[in-house]
A protein has these predicted regions:
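Short, well-ordered beta-strand segments
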Residues: 18, 48, 66-70, 113, ...
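Bilobed "Venus flytrap"/periplasmic-binding protein-like clamshell domains
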Residues: 1, 23, 43-100, 118
């Protein structure tokens, strides 16, 4: 499921549990009718650049930088907030599917690729020349990730929560 499709699939009953890189946020918890049952991983958003770009830190970003990411994600919002906080004018390039983001970045359509750092590490392996890319050291967010269920089914919520707890212990 794409980031755009995931919540509809869960709320419609197409799936019973969403277990992927979905950040637990107040608005998602309160507004969409979802219940986050716990956290199984804390990630953080970062940036990947080409090693030959001369960029070694987010402090090296300049006005006009283009940044690829997934649409409909906290990553997209964090990216906007980050660049605005640094007064950097940037060109957002957003795609629905992660593979589209990877292909666009790999083809040179954007200067940087941003998502959770675990995702950057994994997606880097899909590049045509993975060793030509690096993840910058800065982390611009803290992302609590874990399974999500529809609100209103306390028994199923308990099953998923205790399954998660068992795996963590």
């Amino acid at each position: 499921l794409s980031a755009k499709e995931r919540f509809t699939a869960l709320t419609s009953g197409e799936i019973d549990v969403l277990a992927r890189n979905t950040t637990w946020t107040l608005s998602r918890d309160a507004d969409i009718g979802l219940t986050f049952v716990g956290v199984n991983f804390y990630d953080g958003q970062g940036f990947m650049v080409r090693k030959n770009s001369g960029i070694n830190s987010v402090n090296d970003f300049k006005n006009g930088i283009s940044a690829c990411t997934n649409t409909g994600t906290t990553t997209e919002l964090n990216m906007r907030d980050f660049f605005n906080s640094k007064n950097i004018k940037y060109e957002p390039i957003a795609f629905e599917k992660a593979d589209e983001v990877v292909q666009a970045y790999d083809a040179g359509r954007c200067d940087t690729y941003t998502t959770d750092k675990s995702g950057l590490a994994a997606q880097r392996t899909k590049m045509s020349n993975p060793d030509e890319h690096k993840v910058l050291p800065e982390t611009i967010s803290k992302e609590p990730l874990g399974p999500v269920v529809r609100q209103g089914d306390a028994v199923w919520e308990d099953i998923v929560r205790w399954s998660l707890n068992t795996m963590i212990e």
